[in-house]
Each structure stands twice: as structure tokens, then as C-alpha cells.
Amino acid sequence: MNNIVARATVALERRRDDAASTPLVRDDAQRSIDVIQTFQRSANELDLWQSSYAEPPARPAALNINGVEISVFPDALALAQVRGDDRVGQVFIRCTIGQQGDAAENRRAEANGHLATIAHIHATHYLTHRGTPHAPTSIVLDVSRQQIIRGPANTARRIANIEMACTMIAALWPSA
């Protein structure tokens, strides 16, 4: 993970310091650097170093759930060894601030839980060559809230809910 963060920071610093870049691009680069630094502090405080991390595939295959195609672009792969078993999951880093209040926080928590579950489903389809897909190894790191949301150990209920939602979406949205 440190190599990924270091490469991203160097690229952003180049963009920020490039006189040919527009003020908007330079400002965006600086804000991205600030987010990366916040992420690093969060990663240290949340003890994310139980796993090793690798770059995800450049063009991950789409996930098709009951006729709905879902693009899944993780920020990293998580690789862990538990009791001699190589486990794999996907990592999503969320840096959005979002709204305050209990209702907004509940929606955010639910969305992060669904994202962690979708990451696990995607891993079961496309990452078995890297290890055994393991739901708790797929995580969403909510940087602004300094929270880790892991895929649930028992995924059956959440997967059934996602499948049902996709069935409804496929029935309602006309296909091209």
C-alpha cells in the first residue's frame, strides 16, 4: 500500500507544481494530496497493516448480477493469510465528506456495507487465482469518518438483497 500511496503522491505533486496546469488542476492535485495524507493517518490509527496490499487489475471485469452490469474498480487488493489460508479481498477508499446527521450517517453506513459485499462478490468471480475470497478481507475505508467497513462474515442476507435489487432494476430499466 505504501508504494501505491507514494506513486500517487509523486504524480500529484508533479501535477500541482506544473506551471502548465490550470489553477483548478493544481488545486485539485493539492486537495488530493491532503486526502492521501489523511488516509495515511487513518490507516495507521485503524491498523490496516494486518493484510498486504497489491495494485488491482487495470481493467477489472464487470460483475453481472441478475441482468445488471456493475463496474467494480477497487483501489487495491487485500491479501491476508489466516490459519495458513491465503485470502483475498478488495479495498475501496472513500474520501467524500458527505452530509451530517443520523439519517445521512445511516445511509452512508448501509452504502459502505453494500459496497464491501459487492467487492466480495466480485472477488469470488474474478480473484480466486489470488486466494480464497473472504468477505471480511474486502473493506471500504471511509477516510473522512476514520472507519473500516468490512464485508460481513455472513453475506447471504446482504447478497440476497443485492440480487433482489438488481432483478428489480433489470425489470424496470429498458435495455438498449
Roles of regions detected by a PLM:
Residues 1-176:
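Electrostatic, structured charged patches in enzyme active sites and in nucleic-acid/phosphate-binding
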